[in-house]
């Protein structure tokens, strides 16, 4: 088994999908959490000067959230059973990542650095908030229909097997739902899916014991 180290800030943020994949697979890894105060000295050492970054056996470094997530999903069997399923898992995951990305951008400073705190103005810049809300309106109805189309009577996007797509539905919507608890009231299928992910045999213990962070 390879040795994995996942590098990210001490937040869920863009790394949580990777942590969920490790948890679902029951694979041990080093969850290296970088304090914001340490980041300026480490930034130049990271590929693309960004995190998350996955280190494999101290030989290979993979930056970019979804590149890491796809790699882990393929390695651990959460990427679909054939090429068509894999394509579906990927576009569903990318749709949810669009929501996550637009949400987190509302809490970046003028230099595109995450603040990891909510100011008194909860809404952030009106332009970024508008973009985020448009992304929700564009994606959530489509995902609700997609879930009904593909699940084939099963519990998840690809039937009876949980994939990266289901985990992305859970983690990408965590912060938005914390801010707006009624977000999925018009999307009961997505709401029920998130409950099933939360209750998954491997996922439930992880979600209960993980560190509590604001983002």
Curated annotation (Swiss-Prot):
What does the record give under GO molecular function? Answer: glutathione transferase activity; structural constituent of eye lens
Q: Which CDD domains match?
A: GST_C_Sigma_like, GST_N_Sigma_like
Task: Give a yes or no for keyword Transit peptide in this entry.
Answer: no
Q: Where is the GST N-terminal domain?
A: 2-80
Record keywords, A-Z? Eye lens protein
Domain GST C-terminal as annotated: residue spans? 82-215
- InterPro entries registered for this protein in UniProt: Glutathione-S-Trfase_C-like, Glutathione-S-Trfase_C_sf, Glutathione_S-Trfase, Glutathione_S-Trfase_N, GST_C, GST_superfamily, S-crystallin, Thioredoxin-like_sf
Q: Which domain of life is it from?
A: Eukaryota
State any GO BP term from the record. Answer: glutathione metabolic process
- Quote the tissue specificity entry: Lens.
What the entry lists under Pfam families is as follows: GST_C_3, GST_N
**PANTHER family, alphabetized:** GLUTATHIONE S-TRANSFERASE (PTHR11571:SF150)
Q: What does this protein do?
A: S-crystallins are structural components of squids and octopi eye lens. Contains relatively little if any GST activity.
Family under the similarity heading: Belongs to the GST superfamily.
> Under what name is this protein listed?
S-crystallin 2
Organism whose genome encodes this protein: Enteroctopus dofleini (North Pacific giant octopus)
Q: What is the lineage of its organism?
A: Eukaryota, Metazoa, Spiralia, Lophotrochozoa, Mollusca
